A protein has these predicted regions:
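Glycine-rich, proline-tolerant flexible connector loops at the mouths of alpha/beta enzymes
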Residues: 60-80, 99-100, 219, 351-363
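An alpha-helical appendage that flanks or caps ligand/catalytic pockets
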Residues: 4-34, 147-182, 223-346, 375, ...
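Hydrophobic faces of well-ordered beta-strands that scaffold small-molecule active sites
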Residues: 3-7, 61-63, 93-96, 124-128, ...
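N-terminal beta1-alpha1-beta2 module of alpha/beta enzyme domains
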Residues: 1-88, 190-191, 389-393, 401-413
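Acidic (Asp/Glu)-rich catalytic clusters
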Residues: 54-55, 81-90, 113, 117-124, ...
Length: 413
């Protein structure tokens, strides 16, 4: 099992009352509320936490990016990945990920990722995402072409990594007269690609066709089983049997020396969900064309008050009761994690350990307890349950490189 640490890197040093007063904290919430002095301090603390995670034995650091909102300070995941490539020695640098539809030049992105892979001596995992709905608006990208741009940018990046240049690319959304990057990944044929997501069936099917691991982002156990069913069926149709090496899960788990402290800090997971801030208007987050028509309709009905939030709005107590948030001492959370592993069988587990206004000191304590008391037990259970990571299973990077297919595949599509 591959065990990694994650935090959204929240810009928590702003007046949350202003967000509540405005009614949203994404897209149009003014950046006059951003404090660069506090931002500089927070960036330093997050870097210290990542370096400490490596020191206590954590396998990987998961990074992401978001835009125009305080819940995530990473405007470019590749920047922190570059820093970690030069300041760490062992941990995998897992980008989940670069929002491909927002990229106007995928070749530049391919070059950046290749540099990170070389500087880190082959420790990059390059995940790709579609980007949030409001981020399409922020960058001026037509959300109706989101999936087309995602798939075409992916294909162009992979070709730039694997096919010697120069060659020409004349696509629907990207045109390059000369593709010939003089920066190529150290890992061959190219760095592993993992695909995170929540509810998009189209993305699950696409990932399975590519044979890329799919990382379920804190979905419920029943939802996660539905995801694996769709993935497994797609994999079987593509000619291979999927397993734990194709499955990842992001869980919100905060550990502390006492249960009282853990509960106090874990309540900060509600910070991003709008209990303390506000987040985006549903129509901004789900612009026309971004979701399938049925998904779009459910969010619009919610926005105008005709229906409940399709993603639900459970309280902290409800999420703790059903395992969506786990908190306590290591001994208290381990049985709940064991249940999660038995039910969802992931070969990749990302622990979202800290959020909101959790102090730097408490964040470091959580990381220490994860690395020294929680993860060692999880590794033993993973061996018992046969939960191999893609690295342990030596899974192919892409279906195009598979040697175990029940029927030949010309290329991943």
């Amino acid at each position: 099992m591959h065990l990694m640490y994650f935090t959204e890197q929240p810009m928590s040093a702003y007046d949350a009352k202003e967000g509540l007063k405005y009614g949203a904290t994404a897209l149009t919430f003014s950046n006059k509320h951003f404090d660069p002095v506090a931002g500089s301090r927070l960036y330093g603390e997050y870097l210290e936490q990542y370096i400490y995670a490596e020191q206590v034995g954590i396998d990987g650091i998961m990074l992401n990016e978001h835009h125009n909102a305080p819940f995530c300070m990473q405007a470019k995941a590749n920047i922190f990945a570059s820093v970690l490539a030069g300041t760490t020695q062992r941990v995998k640098i897992v980008l989940l990920g670069n929002p491909l539809p927002l990229a106007e030049n995928p070749i530049r992105l391919a070059e950046e990722l290749a540099m990170i892979d070389m500087i880190s001596k082959g420790r990059l995992v390059s995940g790709f995402v579609r980007g949030g709905g409001q981020e399409q608006r922020a960058t001026g990208v037509n959300p109706a072409y989101n999936r087309e741009r995602f798939e075409e940018a992916h294909d162009l990046i992979v070709k730039a990594w694997t096919v010697p240049g120069p060659f020409r690319w004349e696509g629907t959304h990207y045109q390059h007269r000369v593709v010939n990057p003089w920066a190529l990944p150290l890992q061959k044929p190219y760095p592993r690609v993992w695909i995170p997501g929540v509810i998009s069936k189209e993305t699950i099917i696409w990932a399975a066709k590519q044979r890329y691991p799919y990382i379920a982002l804190n979905t419920s156990i029943p939802q996660t089983k539905q995801i694996w069913k769709l993935y497994d069926d797609t994999a079987a149709a593509a000619g291979y049997q999927s397993g734990p090496e194709n499955r990842g899960y992001l869980a919100r788990i905060h550990v502390a020396e006492t249960e009282e402290k853990a509960i106090q800090n874990a309540k900060q997971f509600m910070w991003m969900q709008g209990e303390f801030t506000g987040l985006a208007h549903p129509v901004w987050a789900n612009p026309s064309g971004y979701f399938s028509p049925s998904g779009r309709r459910s969010f619009v009905e919610f926005a105008v008050g005709r229906a409940k939030n399709p993603r639900g709005n459970p309280t902290f107590e409800e999420q703790r009761a059903d395992g969506m948030i786990m908190c306590g001492t290591p001994k208290q959370v381990l049985p709940r994690i064991r249940h999660l592993l038995e039910e969802t069988r992931p070969g990749i587990l990302a622990v979202w350990g800290n959020d909101g206004n959790v102090s730097h000191s408490d964040s470091m304590t959580c990381i220490r307890l994860l690395g020294q008391e929680v993860f060692p037990q999880l590794r033993e259970w993973a061996k018992e349950l046969g939960l191999d990571s893609p690295f342990e299973a030596e899974a192919p990077v892409n279906i195009a490189y598979a040697k175990d297919l029940k029927r030949p595949v010309a290329a991943a599509g």
